Amino acid sequence: MSHFFEELDYSKTPLGELVLRRRRILKLDRDVVEVILNDEHLMSDYFTVSEVALANIPMALLAADAPDILVGGLGLGYTADAVLGHDHVRSLTVIEYLAPVIRWHHQGVLPLGTTLSDDPRCTLVEGDFFALA
C-alpha cells in the first residue's frame, strides 16, 4: 500500500503553481496521480478513456500508411501513448507548454513511466502549440 497523499513535484510556471501528486482512494483501493494548477484539478489518471479515445477515433479514420502525428498537450501522456499504440505511426510530435510536464515523462515519475521518452517515434517539444502548429 502507498502513502495516503504524496506531493511528487512542485513547480512555478508561467501559468502558475503546478503540482504533481499521488493520493490513495481507500474506497477503490488504488492510487490516483493528479495534476493541479493553481489549486485547481487539471487532470488525473483515474479516468483516461476520453484521452485514449481522443487518439483512437481519428486514428481509425486516418487513411495514411505511415502518418506523422502532431498532438497539442502532453499531460499524463495517455493520448500520446494511444497514438503510439498504432504500429503504423511513423512519428509523433507532442507540443507541451509546461516544461515540468515534459520533465516528468523523462524522469518516469508518471504512471506510464518513460514509455513516451523511450519510443524513438516520439518527440516531446516545449512550446505553445498554437504558435508552433
Residue ranges and their predicted role:
Residues 31-33, 45-48:
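Short, glycine/acidic-enriched capping/hinge loops at junctions between secondary-structure elements
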Residues 47-133:
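The AdoMet/dcAdoMet-binding core of the Class I SAM-like
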Residues 1-33:
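N-terminal auxiliary segments of SAM/dcSAM-dependent transferases
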